[in-house]
Amino acid sequence: MSKPTREEATEAVRTLLKFIGEDPSREGLLQTPDRVINSYVEIFSGYGKDVAEILNTKFYETCNFQDFILLNIKFTSFCEHHILPFNGTVDIAYIPDNCIVGISKLARIVNIFARRLQIQEKMTVQIAESVQENLKPLGVAVKISAVHSCMSMRGVMQDNSVMNTMHYTGIFAEQQKYRHEFLNLTAKR
């Protein structure tokens, strides 16, 4: 599949405007197709980014960390089913084996995966598995809590529903006490 040109993408937006009953040549909509394409370039900038590159700078520490937890990383993504936004928070914990990364790197990983068409379940796994693969910690725990526009703007029209997904690797998957501690910490907000 070849990537459409910017002009083809802009024309597709004009076609969608016509489809919903709008006139793309009216004054308020003249620049809308270009604005939509510019927005999409930014919103979906996670494609082509390499998580391994982000996690390249590691700190090899001799101190013995019990665990490392970063809570409340905010994100907005778009569901691949309706191309509507879902937004929420990501909590990440890992138990280092011999290296750690700066905390901003974890937020950058979230942004890479959030800036793609997604489903929350897959994004949860992608974040956890990328930390596991690149840092090789004893275990990783990831929890995502999000509100989905596809539930609030259409269909069942439930605007207060929050979806929670979790994924565990290593010691978090193997030992309940680590999962329990992680879930207790994430629930205290």
Curated annotation (Swiss-Prot):
Enzyme class, UniProt record, top EC level: hydrolase
A Gene Ontology BP annotation from the UniProt entry: tetrahydrofolate biosynthetic process
Name this protein carries in UniProt: GTP cyclohydrolase 1
HAMAP family recorded: FolE (MF_00223)
GO molecular function per UniProt: GTP binding; GTP cyclohydrolase I activity; zinc ion binding
Binding positions for Zn(2+) per the UniProt entry: 79, 82, 150
The UniProt record lists the keyword Transport: no
UniProt similarity note: Belongs to the GTP cyclohydrolase I family.
Pathway(s) served: Cofactor biosynthesis; 7,8-dihydroneopterin triphosphate biosynthesis; 7,8-dihydroneopterin triphosphate from GTP: step 1/1
Keywords assigned: GTP-binding, Hydrolase, Metal-binding, Nucleotide-binding, One-carbon metabolism, Zinc
Catalytic activity, as annotated: GTP + H2O = 7,8-dihydroneopterin 3'-triphosphate + formate + H(+)
Gene Ontology CC, one term: cytoplasm
The protein's Enzyme Commission number: 3.5.4.16
PROSITE patterns referenced in this protein's UniProt entry, alphabetically: GTP_CYCLOHYDROL_1_1, GTP_CYCLOHYDROL_1_2
Lineage, highest ranks first: Bacteria, Pseudomonadati, Pseudomonadota, Alphaproteobacteria, Rickettsiales
Superkingdom of source: Bacteria
InterPro entries per the UniProt record, alphabetical: GTP-CH-I_C/QueF (IPR043133), GTP-CH-I_N (IPR043134), GTP_CycHdrlase_I (IPR001474), GTP_CycHdrlase_I_CS (IPR018234), GTP_CycHdrlase_I_dom (IPR020602)
Assembly and interaction partners: Homomer.
